[in-house]
Amino acid sequence: MPPIPFLTGCRRALRGLGVAALLGSAAPWALAQLHTQPLNSGWQFRLADPEAAKAHPEAADWRGATVPGTVQTDLLDARLIPDPFHGENEARLQWIGLSDWEYRLAFDVDAATLSREQVELVFDGLDTFAQVSLNGQALAATDNMFRRWRLPAKALLKPGRNTLLVRLQSPIRKMQPWLLKQPYALPGAYDSQFGDEPKGVATATYVRKAQYQYGWDWGPRFVTLGIWQPVRLESWDHLRIEDFHMRQPRVDEGVAQLAAELEVQAGRGGSARLQVEVTPPEGAPFTLTRDVVLDPGRNALSVPVRIERPRRWFPAGYGEQPMYRFRASLTQDGVELAHAERRTGLRSVELRREKDAWGRSFAFVINGIPVFAKGANMIPLDSFPNRVTRERQRALLLSARRANMNMLRLWGGGYYESDAFYEEADALGLLIWQDFMFGGAILPADTAFQENVRQEAIEQVRRLRDHPSIVLWCGGNEVQADWETWDATLAFKNKLSPDERERLWSANLKLFGEVLRGVVQREAPDVPYWATSPGVDLEGPSGQMDDGDMHFWRVWGGSAPVETFLDTTPRFMSEYGLQSYPEMRTIASFAGPQDLRLDSPVMRAHQKFGVAAGPDVGNDRLLFYIRKGYGEPKDFASFVYLSQVMQAEGIELAASHLRSRRPRSMGSLYWQLNDVWPGASWSSVDVSGRWKALQFHARRFYADTTVTALRRAGETEIAVVSDRTQPQDAELRLRVSDLDGRVLRSERATVTARPLAVTPVWHRADAELLQGADPARTVAEVELLVQGRAVARQTVYFVPARELKLADPGFQTRLERDPAGGADAWRLAIKTRSFARAVWIDFGPLEVELADNALDIRAGEEVLIPLRATASPGDLQAHLNLRSLADSTVR
């Protein structure tokens, strides 16, 4: 296949201007301080597509724009389009991504800026094919959403008013004519539902842009364009610190041996003094000084830094997250010429892969501690990245932390997150598995494409490598699995000649096995690299049970029963999941009362699974699992509730099984934590930040110390699982009772939970537990107590939920203020007459933060649930609604 056209010459103008700028006359180093002029305000945008303007003339006028931003959100702010997430608006708004757009800015430049030797226009991110001109002169053409574009601009700037124009081309319309002329099209992840691209001819694979924006099986197709990251003008005289990084070749309890590494751009040679100031989390700062000689061009500097008995950064649950601050400065004759700062935590990271009785391990070892990874996969927080605030990021990460997660996998079909995101992860002790941005498609064999990716990887690794939260760089998502197992790709491969198959796959192996690996090994050698997920680091086929990581989709994707999870024990489960709908309040944000049925056009539009095979595949799959496990939903609201119950209980089964098989299994990352829009998906937190039942379950099944009670083939294994680093004394109570609360049998045991291990306690057959009782009216409860306080509970059922003879629980409730918690603190007391399974508490339209939900309540038991709400007591009582399995199915 010939080279991709936009990669062969788009930066020629940029190169020429760069050479001219670097050959300019010298200026004193004393003027070298970097000056930054933000250029984020005052932008305007318009539709620059004559054909599209015929249908949308109002968009062809210049209007105010937001930078950073996207065309779609600018149109929304201008009230030129409706809410993209509402109803069927997705289909109505596809024209935006198929059109070209222009952004312009008038800005002033003062004489002091123009007197600087170096003046650069810096775009931190352009989405994606942009032609940039300054004062009517072409400056650059860009082709990668994930790269920073630093454009020498002095030759084109003038004193006073300047005009910057950015023309953005539709990535679909730009690439499609070229692709249609090629011998073949690489199979993409998902074909468009809207007819703008022929089936099997997806352009997304060829474009360095967030792949999810072309549509996924959990999100809409909104192909964005825009200036999606900040813009600024930078000026300096001869000297700029291009990069500053703290390497951590050795960190242990006794010493941290670090290296302050700088890359300095100098316009001419000369001497300077390099100072590195170290500010520990506690105690006095200290400074290291070294005299250096700089050559013209790029200079690599390194200063060893030794810290005795460092305060190390630990993952959540294993210790604190102290951060050190490092400041590097270059001075001459006491005058500071340039400086840079970094904050980082000191820790060691190992991806341990050792031969053992089950094959080869896959375990993250942080500061010498083997950490069982508990968490989820994370996708972008919105279809439109500029709407993602730091507050939304922090809220989502807090949701993960409050659910006892310690790791998130940042999936490769989105975009590299902002610095703020990783700062929050650092502070919360959340480990980050960071994919490079490849979402699951075979990639072009073009060498220019690979070079573009290499530059992208260098920039992103350099930007993010000082975050202690990042403990793995992974080449991408499901690329090898795609090549080996996906039906569409297998059919595509069969049409290629053997030579072309070899050429194409060899290029992909080079990208993930050499190019990206080489970038990480050079730029962040203290963090492991993993070629593709799932896989064994390209050492064999993907999807192996005894080596590497696994994506397990026989459940849901293959319609296997959820009990299949109990027979699946990979070394690390990095994807598995079940779908559900968000709660009714979230559904009301995109659907009206008339839409609340599964076959309505609106509900179909917000269910993306399996749409290529038909509009009802996803909802039919949900109904299949609900009916199999729980019965027939009695109405739409019950369907929504049961979808969450099914998801939560199914994922709990899998996660509990994986934790109970430690150290054979050392990771559980379910798919997925969050959403980009409101609709059916695998998430545990919906796009509004509301917790589904799964998130409440995760808080329990990911607890540092918990009990597992796993029943298969008529036998139940009960064990205590501990992620603590010290032994823990506990008591285990087993109680068998009928649904009316009559105790049939009880048992107790004292146990010392082994650290970082599973402690088996009981193995009981059904006959031993039931002793002749009706299995449809009997449950076994296992409770774990530490220092007399119940910290975990598991319920064992002897029949599927649909066969349980549940009665009306007879809920009794009491709402009382919690004087110790503040003005918005309450406690909700719930008591039942008979056993209540999967109790869901909601307050209708009121925003209420519940400390617990989605729980079982035994007959006669009163539970107290803390909550926070600003509503009045009357409103809370009026809107309180309790639901359970007993009243949600047709009986």
Residue ranges and their predicted role:
Residues 169-176, 332-337, 785-792, 887-890:
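Short acidic/polar inter-strand loop motif in beta-rich domains
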Residues 114-117, 157-161, 309-323, 768-778, ...:
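Short glycine/proline/serine/threonine-rich loop/turn segments at secondary-structure transition edges
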Residues 262-265, 599-852, 857-867, 876-879, ...:
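Carbohydrate-binding surfaces of carbohydrate-active enzymes
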Residues 39, 46-48, 78, 98-240, ...:
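Accessory beta-strand-rich segments of carbohydrate-active enzymes
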Residues 77-109, 114-122, 127-134, 140-143, ...:
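Active-site-adjacent substrate/metal-binding segments within catalytic domains
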Residues 32-122, 198-230, 234-239, 354-358, ...:
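Extended carbohydrate-recognition surfaces in non-catalytic/accessory domains of CAZymes
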Residues 407-427, 431-605, 646, 650, ...:
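Substrate-binding/catalytic cleft of secreted carbohydrate-active enzymes
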Residues 155-161, 261-355:
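Extended acidic/polar, glycine-enriched regions
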